[in-house]
Amino acid sequence: NLQEGDEVMVTGPAGKRFLLPEEPERHDYLLLATGTGIAPFRGMIKELLEAPTPSKSDIHLVMGVPYTTDLLYDDFFRELASSFPNFHYHTVVSREIQPDGEPGGYIHHYLDRQIHLHEDLLSRDRTLVYMCGLAGMQLGVFKMMAERGLGDAYLKVKPDYAEVAPAEWDSHSIRKYVRPTHRCMLEVY
């Protein structure tokens, strides 16, 4: 039963990697979220776009959910996308038909199908990738990047695993043999 004026002990922030860089304007961003993994991106995007001088960085947010009713902050992100030409909001709904008529899928399916929208972004030296949400997203995105030849900037594969085809990777093996580089930040659970 705390009373006004009582002292409390707090800690944090606990993370050291899942933050915007010190000079955010020097980077472009691919932000990948599933479910409640959207929460840190809302804060990052607000910091980038609602600053006195909004960021000119290219920012792509891909939000994956089972149903459209699960799209957290959807109106907020759609409004930002209509107000800032450098902010792009993409939704992936796994258990419904997509707006383009494609079947539902996961974030890695979307990125693979729409690679023409993201290949240039992923090929830039200034791009950072952030993933927050379900751990299954990490496996799918890592495999897609490696299969598309985009993984070198974002993934470090241990030498004794380099000959294994990405299609054969599984969640156990990526934890053991595949690490994100300094350009790929993960917060998966």
Each model region followed by its residue ranges:
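Histidine-anchored nucleotide/phosphate-binding helix
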Residues: P40-P52
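Catalytic cysteine-centered active loop of the rhodanese-like fold, especially the PTP/DSP P-loop
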Residues: L30-A33, M131
